[in-house]
Design a protein with these regions (language model features):
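Residues that scaffold the ATP/ADP-binding catalytic core of kinase and kinase-like folds
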Residues: 17, 92, 185, 224, ...
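Glycine-rich phosphate/adenosyl-contacting loop at the front of the ribokinase-like
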Residues: 1-66, 80, 240
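Conserved beta-alpha-beta core of the PfkB/ribokinase-like small-molecule kinase fold
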Residues: 117, 122-202, 219-221
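Structural alpha-helical scaffold elements that stabilize or flank donor/cofactor-binding regions
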Residues: 110-111, 167-168, 205
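Conserved N-terminal subdomain of the carbohydrate kinase-like
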Residues: 41-122, 146
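Conserved phosphate-binding/catalytic region of the ribokinase-like
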Residues: 1-5, 193-290
Length: 290
């Protein structure tokens, strides 16, 4: 594996308006940040507006020493109002914003052709334009050993459909979902209610997936592979402050572990430890302990 290749967070660039203040948010920045903390080449790809919030995102990415490709478009920069209810984030997402209008440009094609991994979700595909761009990007990456096309489903409000989820599963070879989200897709794909392993293995068979990652909060997490391997890790006991960003830190750490040559269990263990640490911090992108 060429560790100089891009590991891409593709999707929504926005501000999380938390009770504690404004924090850089969205899948691309979160994922790319945690990739960079693993010492690999994370890059955030999205779109922002030509406005103060957009310029602020660019400044924040630079302050976090993140590589990025942020298109400037004629729409306002994305904002999400985040309220913490019992420590868990509840999202109120503004519509018709910059990241709904990401173009597939020649530079994006260059990034795709030089990427070994991408993480994308359903939220950034709520608009036809950005959905088309996500699809083009993943198709341009190609397939093969060491190429990770990660669909981190990220169900938010009403911004998803079976059509988007099914197409995304067919485009991906790694699927990340949590225990709340799997309940939502169970009737869509006639999964076995309450049986996580049967459900995840059915998804592997239906969509020719290599890996399914299932996180269950305090109840631990599972990794299921297409060769029958199962890994379970319990969730470390920590004094959680909030869980914003924990999921993306988990996914980024796991994928970086595989790219660095770790096995499934070792990569899973590292992902669990990092996600637990992120839960003890304010915001999605805390500085890692050295």
């Amino acid at each position: 594996m060429n560790k100089n290749k891009f590991i891409v967070g593709l999707g929504e660039a926005l501000w999380d308006m938390l009770p504690t203040g404004k924090k850089l948010g969205g899948a691309p920045a979160n994922f790319a940040y945690h990739v960079s903390q693993q010492g690999l080449k994370g890059i955030a790809v999205s779109a922002v507006g030509s406005d103060a919030l957009g310029y602020g995102i660019i400044d924040a990415l630079k302050e976090n020493n993140l590589d990025f490709y942020m298109q400037s478009v004629a729409y306002p920069t994305g904002v999400v109002n985040v309220e913490l209810i019992d420590g868990k984030p509840d999202y109120h997402i503004v519509e018709d914003v910059a990241w709904d209008n990401i173009e597939f440009t020649p530079h994006m094609e260059y990034i795709a052709r030089n990427a070994c991994a991408v993480c994308f979700g359903s939220l950034a595909q709520r608009s036809p334009k950005s959905r088309h761009t996500v699809r083009r990007f993943i198709e341009t990456m190609g397939v093969g050993d060491g190429i990770y096309r990660v669909f981190d489903i990220n169900l938010r409000q009403h911004f998803y459909s079976r059509d988007v989820i099914e197409e995304s599963l067919r485009l991906s070879n790694v699927f990340k979902i949590n225990d709340d989200e799997i309940k939502i897709i169970t009737p869509m794909f006639e999964l076995t209610e309450g049986d996580y392993e049967a459900s995840c293995r059915k998804l592997i068979a239906m969509f020719d997936l290599d890996i399914v990652i299932l996180t269950c909060g305090e109840k631990g997490s599972f990794i299921f592979t297409n060769d029958g391997e199962t890994s379970f890790q319990s969730t470390p006991k920590v004094d959680a402050i909030d869980t914003v960003g924990a999921g993306y830190s988990f996914t980024a750490t796991f994928i970086c572990g595989l790219i660095n040559g770790k096995g499934i269990v070792a990569a899973h263990k590292a992902a669990t430890e990092v996600a637990a640490y992120v839960c003890t911090c304010h915001g999605a992108m805390p500085e890692y302990k050295k």
